[in-house]
Amino acid sequence: MTASVVLLDTNVVLDLLLARKPFDKDAVAIASAVARGELVAYIAATSVTTIHYIARKAIGTLEADRAIGRLLLLFQVAPVTEHVLSTALARAFSDFEDAVLDAAAELVSVNALITRDAQGFTLSKLPVFTPAAFLRAMSAR
């Protein structure tokens, strides 16, 4: 079976990295599926800087640097190019960050977006799942 290819929203990666209860359980399960090769997951390049900024405030600069290093070993990075930004600007999303993630996801041809903010992606052409819903769909295959 071919592995699914997904893009993780920033909030899901922060749940994993900062062990944010009760959301961390699903984030850990998704990361474990990636580590086992059952899933390919991207994070957007812009998410990396946001994740570092928030993590640095919570766990300090050195630990945030180490955490980013681990994330880069586990996840692929979806580029945020001028084309991605222009595409995002042309979309009618209410949140520009969500539009950027959606356009980056399309650029790398993912099968789905995984987010805790599914309402932010109602205009996406891609299937959008919460982490829990994605895990249920994965286990049903």
Q: Locations of the language-model features?
A:
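Short, well-structured N-terminal submotif of metal-dependent ribonuclease cores
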Residues: 1-43, 56-66, 123, 129-141
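Alpha-helix capping/helix-boundary segments
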Residues: 12, 47, 84, 100-101, ...
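Short, well-structured alpha-helical segments
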Residues: 65-69, 85-86
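Short beta-strand segments at enzyme active-site cores
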Residues: 43-45, 115
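Active-site neighborhoods of divalent-metal-dependent phosphate/nucleic-acid chemistry enzymes
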Residues: 73-118
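Short acidic-hydrophobic, aromatic-tinged amphipathic segments that line or gate anion-handling sites
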Residues: 78-80, 128-131
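Short, structured coil segments at secondary-structure junctions
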Residues: 109, 124-125
